[in-house]
Amino acid sequence: MSDASAGGWADRDSYLVSTDWLGEHLDDPKIRILDCRMYFDGRLGIDAYNQGHIPGADFINWGTELATKENPVAFKMARSEQMKRVMEAHGVGDDTLLVAYDEEGGHHAARVWLAMLVHGHEAGFRILEGGLTKWQQEGRPISTAPAEARTVTFTPLAGPADVLVTAEHVLSAANDTNAVVVDVRRLTEYTGEEVRAVRGGRVPGSVRVFWQDLLHWDTDRTFKSPQEIRALLAAAGVTPDRRAITYCQGAVRAAHTALVLKMLGYENVEVYDGSWEEWGSRPDLPIATG
Protein backbone atom coordinates (compact mmCIF):
# COMPACT_ATOMS: atom_id res chain seq x y z
CA MET A 1 0.00 0.00 0.00
CA SER A 2 1.39 3.40 -0.96
CA ASP A 3 1.78 6.21 1.56
CA ALA A 4 -0.86 8.20 -0.31
CA SER A 5 -3.42 5.40 -0.31
CA ALA A 6 -2.76 4.97 3.40
CA GLY A 7 -3.43 8.64 3.99
CA GLY A 8 0.22 9.71 3.94
CA TRP A 9 2.18 12.00 1.67
CA ALA A 10 2.21 11.06 -2.01
CA ASP A 11 5.45 12.88 -2.79
CA ARG A 12 7.02 14.88 0.00
CA ASP A 13 10.67 14.52 -0.98
CA SER A 14 10.18 16.26 -4.34
CA TYR A 15 9.10 19.43 -2.55
CA LEU A 16 10.81 19.65 0.85
CA VAL A 17 14.17 19.23 2.52
CA SER A 18 14.76 19.05 6.25
CA THR A 19 16.99 21.22 8.39
CA ASP A 20 19.15 18.15 9.01
CA TRP A 21 19.59 17.63 5.29
CA LEU A 22 20.43 21.26 4.58
CA GLY A 23 22.84 21.35 7.50
CA GLU A 24 24.76 18.52 5.84
CA HIS A 25 24.75 20.19 2.41
CA LEU A 26 25.62 23.82 3.16
CA ASP A 27 28.90 23.51 1.25
CA ASP A 28 27.49 21.65 -1.75
CA PRO A 29 28.31 23.78 -4.84
CA LYS A 30 25.27 22.44 -6.68
CA ILE A 31 22.91 23.99 -4.13
CA ARG A 32 21.82 27.63 -3.97
CA ILE A 33 19.90 28.83 -0.93
CA LEU A 34 17.51 31.76 -1.27
CA ASP A 35 16.16 33.77 1.66
CA CYS A 36 12.60 34.73 0.69
CA ARG A 37 11.52 36.70 3.74
CA MET A 38 9.02 39.49 3.21
CA TYR A 39 6.97 41.57 5.63
CA PHE A 40 3.84 43.69 5.38
CA ASP A 41 4.39 45.72 8.55
CA GLY A 42 7.04 48.14 7.35
CA ARG A 43 10.03 45.86 7.89
CA LEU A 44 12.19 44.93 4.92
CA GLY A 45 13.28 41.42 4.09
CA ILE A 46 16.73 42.60 3.04
CA ASP A 47 17.26 44.16 6.47
CA ALA A 48 16.38 40.87 8.15
CA TYR A 49 18.74 39.07 5.77
CA ASN A 50 21.58 41.44 6.58
CA GLN A 51 21.04 40.90 10.30
CA GLY A 52 21.44 37.16 9.88
CA HIS A 53 20.63 34.34 7.48
CA ILE A 54 21.44 30.73 6.75
CA PRO A 55 25.11 30.52 5.69
CA GLY A 56 25.55 30.82 1.93
CA ALA A 57 22.05 32.14 1.32
CA ASP A 58 21.31 34.96 -1.09
CA PHE A 59 18.33 37.28 -0.64
CA ILE A 60 15.57 37.52 -3.25
CA ASN A 61 12.94 40.23 -3.17
CA TRP A 62 10.48 37.95 -4.92
CA GLY A 63 7.62 40.42 -4.60
CA THR A 64 9.25 42.67 -7.18
CA GLU A 65 11.80 40.44 -8.88
CA LEU A 66 9.38 37.65 -9.78
CA ALA A 67 6.35 39.80 -10.60
CA THR A 68 5.67 41.20 -14.04
CA LYS A 69 5.87 44.97 -14.34
CA GLU A 70 3.24 44.94 -17.08
CA ASN A 71 0.21 44.22 -14.92
CA PRO A 72 -1.35 46.30 -12.12
CA VAL A 73 -1.96 43.19 -10.01
CA ALA A 74 0.90 43.17 -7.52
CA PHE A 75 2.39 39.69 -7.83
CA LYS A 76 1.32 38.60 -11.32
CA MET A 77 3.82 35.99 -12.50
CA ALA A 78 6.99 37.16 -14.26
CA ARG A 79 7.56 36.19 -17.86
CA SER A 80 10.39 33.98 -19.04
CA GLU A 81 12.90 36.73 -19.91
CA GLN A 82 12.54 38.27 -16.47
CA MET A 83 12.73 34.87 -14.78
CA LYS A 84 15.97 34.09 -16.61
CA ARG A 85 17.54 37.40 -15.62
CA VAL A 86 16.56 37.10 -11.97
CA MET A 87 17.59 33.48 -11.51
CA GLU A 88 20.97 34.06 -13.12
CA ALA A 89 21.52 37.13 -10.95
CA HIS A 90 20.98 34.94 -7.89
CA GLY A 91 23.26 32.15 -9.07
CA VAL A 92 20.49 29.70 -9.94
CA GLY A 93 21.34 27.76 -13.09
CA ASP A 94 19.86 24.89 -15.03
CA ASP A 95 21.68 22.31 -12.89
CA THR A 96 21.21 24.07 -9.55
CA LEU A 97 19.12 22.70 -6.72
CA LEU A 98 17.43 25.80 -5.32
CA VAL A 99 16.48 25.58 -1.63
CA ALA A 100 14.21 28.41 -0.52
CA TYR A 101 13.17 29.43 2.98
CA ASP A 102 11.37 32.12 4.94
CA GLU A 103 10.08 32.28 8.51
CA GLU A 104 6.40 31.69 7.76
CA GLY A 105 6.31 27.98 7.10
CA GLY A 106 7.25 28.28 3.44
CA HIS A 107 4.54 30.82 2.64
CA HIS A 108 6.82 33.13 0.65
CA ALA A 109 9.15 30.40 -0.57
CA ALA A 110 6.13 28.74 -2.19
CA ARG A 111 5.72 31.67 -4.53
CA VAL A 112 9.26 31.00 -5.78
CA TRP A 113 8.26 27.34 -6.17
CA LEU A 114 5.32 28.43 -8.31
CA ALA A 115 7.63 30.51 -10.51
CA MET A 116 9.99 27.56 -10.93
CA LEU A 117 7.04 25.30 -11.78
CA VAL A 118 5.62 27.71 -14.35
CA HIS A 119 9.02 28.08 -16.00
CA GLY A 120 9.76 24.37 -16.15
CA HIS A 121 12.25 23.97 -13.29
CA GLU A 122 10.14 22.47 -10.51
CA ALA A 123 12.49 19.48 -10.25
CA GLY A 124 15.32 21.82 -9.26
CA PHE A 125 13.49 23.34 -6.30
CA ARG A 126 12.89 22.48 -2.64
CA ILE A 127 11.49 24.35 0.35
CA LEU A 128 13.26 24.11 3.70
CA GLU A 129 10.55 22.71 5.95
CA GLY A 130 10.18 24.88 9.03
CA GLY A 131 12.38 27.50 7.42
CA LEU A 132 14.43 29.89 9.48
CA THR A 133 12.06 29.35 12.42
CA LYS A 134 13.05 25.71 12.89
CA TRP A 135 16.67 26.38 11.88
CA GLN A 136 17.11 28.90 14.68
CA GLN A 137 15.17 26.85 17.23
CA GLU A 138 17.70 24.09 16.66
CA GLY A 139 20.62 26.44 17.26
CA ARG A 140 22.05 26.07 13.78
CA PRO A 141 24.58 28.56 12.36
CA ILE A 142 23.61 32.04 11.19
CA SER A 143 25.76 34.26 8.97
CA THR A 144 25.86 37.92 7.97
CA ALA A 145 28.21 37.33 5.03
CA PRO A 146 26.84 38.00 1.54
CA ALA A 147 26.34 35.10 -0.83
CA GLU A 148 29.17 34.16 -3.14
CA ALA A 149 28.58 35.36 -6.71
CA ARG A 150 28.11 32.65 -9.32
CA THR A 151 28.10 32.70 -13.10
CA VAL A 152 25.36 30.39 -14.35
CA THR A 153 22.89 29.93 -17.18
CA PHE A 154 19.18 29.56 -16.46
CA THR A 155 16.99 28.46 -19.35
CA PRO A 156 13.25 28.96 -18.84
CA LEU A 157 11.28 25.98 -20.13
CA ALA A 158 7.63 25.30 -20.81
CA GLY A 159 6.00 24.26 -17.56
CA PRO A 160 2.50 22.80 -17.21
CA ALA A 161 0.08 24.90 -19.25
CA ASP A 162 -2.77 24.74 -16.75
CA VAL A 163 -1.08 25.88 -13.53
CA LEU A 164 -2.05 29.56 -13.56
CA VAL A 165 -5.67 30.32 -14.39
CA THR A 166 -7.74 33.40 -15.16
CA ALA A 167 -10.76 34.95 -13.51
CA GLU A 168 -12.98 33.61 -16.27
CA HIS A 169 -11.68 30.10 -15.60
CA VAL A 170 -12.44 30.50 -11.90
CA LEU A 171 -15.94 31.80 -12.63
CA SER A 172 -16.66 28.72 -14.72
CA ALA A 173 -15.20 26.37 -12.11
CA ALA A 174 -17.33 27.88 -9.34
CA ASN A 175 -20.37 26.29 -11.01
CA ASP A 176 -18.70 22.96 -11.78
CA THR A 177 -19.38 20.15 -9.31
CA ASN A 178 -16.14 18.48 -10.40
CA ALA A 179 -14.13 21.50 -9.28
CA VAL A 180 -13.66 23.37 -6.02
CA VAL A 181 -12.44 26.95 -5.59
CA VAL A 182 -10.38 27.17 -2.41
CA ASP A 183 -10.01 30.47 -0.57
CA VAL A 184 -7.02 30.24 1.78
CA ARG A 185 -7.28 33.71 3.36
CA ARG A 186 -8.17 34.88 6.85
CA LEU A 187 -11.82 34.64 7.86
CA THR A 188 -12.17 38.44 7.87
CA GLU A 189 -11.01 38.56 4.25
CA TYR A 190 -13.34 35.72 3.28
CA THR A 191 -16.42 37.35 4.80
CA GLY A 192 -15.62 40.77 3.36
CA GLU A 193 -15.10 42.45 6.72
CA GLU A 194 -11.46 43.09 5.78
CA VAL A 195 -11.34 44.87 2.41
CA ARG A 196 -8.08 44.70 0.47
CA ALA A 197 -9.37 45.53 -3.02
CA VAL A 198 -12.12 47.77 -4.36
CA ARG A 199 -14.59 45.31 -2.83
CA GLY A 200 -14.32 42.80 -0.03
CA GLY A 201 -15.68 39.28 -0.03
CA ARG A 202 -15.02 36.02 -1.82
CA VAL A 203 -15.65 34.13 -5.02
CA PRO A 204 -19.23 32.81 -4.82
CA GLY A 205 -19.25 29.10 -4.09
CA SER A 206 -15.68 29.04 -2.83
CA VAL A 207 -14.76 27.11 0.30
CA ARG A 208 -12.32 28.31 2.93
CA VAL A 209 -9.22 26.43 4.06
CA PHE A 210 -6.95 28.75 6.04
CA TRP A 211 -3.38 28.15 4.90
CA GLN A 212 -1.87 28.44 8.38
CA ASP A 213 -4.06 25.57 9.57
CA LEU A 214 -1.88 23.23 7.49
CA LEU A 215 1.12 24.05 9.68
CA HIS A 216 2.28 23.74 13.26
CA TRP A 217 2.10 27.51 13.21
CA ASP A 218 2.65 28.16 16.91
CA THR A 219 5.73 25.95 17.20
CA ASP A 220 8.29 25.13 14.49
CA ARG A 221 6.06 25.90 11.48
CA THR A 222 6.53 22.51 9.90
CA PHE A 223 3.61 20.83 8.18
CA LYS A 224 1.00 18.93 10.13
CA SER A 225 0.66 15.24 9.40
CA PRO A 226 -0.84 14.34 6.02
CA GLN A 227 -3.68 12.61 7.83
CA GLU A 228 -4.57 15.81 9.69
CA ILE A 229 -4.36 17.88 6.53
CA ARG A 230 -6.42 15.43 4.48
CA ALA A 231 -9.15 15.50 7.12
CA LEU A 232 -9.18 19.30 7.17
CA LEU A 233 -9.40 19.45 3.38
CA ALA A 234 -12.08 16.77 3.16
CA ALA A 235 -14.23 18.64 5.68
CA ALA A 236 -14.23 21.59 3.29
CA GLY A 237 -14.96 19.44 0.25
CA VAL A 238 -11.44 19.64 -1.16
CA THR A 239 -10.98 16.03 -2.24
CA PRO A 240 -8.56 14.45 -4.73
CA ASP A 241 -11.31 13.63 -7.22
CA ARG A 242 -12.09 17.33 -7.73
CA ARG A 243 -10.06 19.92 -9.59
CA ALA A 244 -8.80 22.41 -7.00
CA ILE A 245 -8.21 26.09 -7.73
CA THR A 246 -6.56 28.03 -4.91
CA TYR A 247 -6.62 31.79 -4.43
CA CYS A 248 -5.83 34.41 -1.81
CA GLN A 249 -5.00 38.11 -2.16
CA GLY A 250 -2.02 37.85 -4.52
CA ALA A 251 -1.50 34.12 -5.23
CA VAL A 252 1.18 33.73 -2.56
CA ARG A 253 -0.71 31.94 0.21
CA ALA A 254 -2.53 30.18 -2.62
CA ALA A 255 0.79 28.87 -3.95
CA HIS A 256 1.58 27.44 -0.51
CA THR A 257 -1.70 25.53 -0.35
CA ALA A 258 -1.29 24.35 -3.94
CA LEU A 259 2.10 22.92 -3.03
CA VAL A 260 0.55 21.02 -0.13
CA LEU A 261 -2.10 19.57 -2.43
CA LYS A 262 0.64 18.42 -4.81
CA MET A 263 2.50 16.74 -1.95
CA LEU A 264 -0.71 14.90 -1.07
CA GLY A 265 -1.03 13.62 -4.63
CA TYR A 266 -3.85 15.83 -5.90
CA GLU A 267 -3.47 15.65 -9.68
CA ASN A 268 -5.48 18.67 -10.79
CA VAL A 269 -4.26 21.73 -8.92
CA GLU A 270 -4.44 25.28 -10.26
CA VAL A 271 -3.68 28.73 -8.88
CA TYR A 272 -5.67 31.86 -9.70
CA ASP A 273 -2.80 34.25 -10.37
CA GLY A 274 -4.83 37.46 -10.11
CA SER A 275 -6.53 36.28 -6.90
CA TRP A 276 -8.65 38.68 -4.86
CA GLU A 277 -6.64 41.74 -5.83
CA GLU A 278 -7.97 41.28 -9.36
CA TRP A 279 -11.36 39.70 -8.61
CA GLY A 280 -12.34 42.24 -5.97
CA SER A 281 -11.39 45.12 -8.24
CA ARG A 282 -13.41 44.00 -11.27
CA PRO A 283 -17.04 45.17 -11.09
CA ASP A 284 -18.08 42.61 -13.72
CA LEU A 285 -17.33 39.69 -11.40
CA PRO A 286 -19.78 38.49 -8.71
CA ILE A 287 -18.88 38.38 -5.03
CA ALA A 288 -20.29 36.84 -1.88
CA THR A 289 -20.00 38.27 1.63
CA GLY A 290 -20.83 37.31 5.18
Report residues per predicted region.
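Thiolate-centered catalytic microenvironments shared by cysteine-dependent enzyme domains
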Residues: 2-12, 74-173, 193-194, 253-275
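Amphipathic, positively biased hydrophobic alpha-helical segments used for protein targeting
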Residues: 68, 102, 150, 212, ...
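Positively charged, proline/Ser/Thr-rich regional signature most characteristic
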Residues: 6-92, 166-240, 281, 287-290
